Amino acid sequence: MAKALATAQRRGQIGDMDMPPSPDPFGIDSLDALESLYDTPSELVRGKVGGRIDAVTARFIAASPFVLLGTQGQRGIHITPRGDPAGFVAVVDEQTLILPDRRGNNRIDALRDILEDDRVSLLIMVPGGGETLRVHGHARITTDPALRARHVAQGREPTSLLVIRVTSLFMQCAKALMRSKLWDGRARPEGLPSMGQLMASQVPGLVESASMDSTYPERIRSTMY
């Protein structure tokens, strides 16, 4: 079989992408093998998941002009960008976000997915802020006229909106954005909550805000690689 495939490839009858994958002698195919590669997450990391949108987290969301939306459906898994002036992701209450859907390429991959599987993830980013907010929940699509009118941008209403019921959220540290230098040269927005403030508010009793903020920068630098 291998000889026949090699011959067909030489003759141009099949391309590299058509070849079946070769076994990887270094591949990881079990949870035990995977976990043996990495340190055990700290108690802080394990316990940092919150279940509601508190006032401090709402300030972070209000400062964001850009989010990534993750969905999945019968056609696969998709991740799509969503952007508008800061504040376009609306916090309705402790469990609810509204995300307007503006004009795009009309593939509507994410919306098709949500009709099949309402689970969604958001990665919420603030230019100049190293931390990101990860949000998980369930979404529904609405064309409520009152909501569309409330989310007008440049004189145009969104075609539809996502109403997202939040089930969990937590902060992601700044390492990835620092390594990428994505915000290099851009100042942190004035008044943006600190990592300590966000985590202390999301999971009361987990950390003391000032103490965490005093050690956080050095902890990030010393564990960057």
How should these model regions be labeled?
Residues 2-225:
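Binding-site signature for planar aromatic cofactors or substrates
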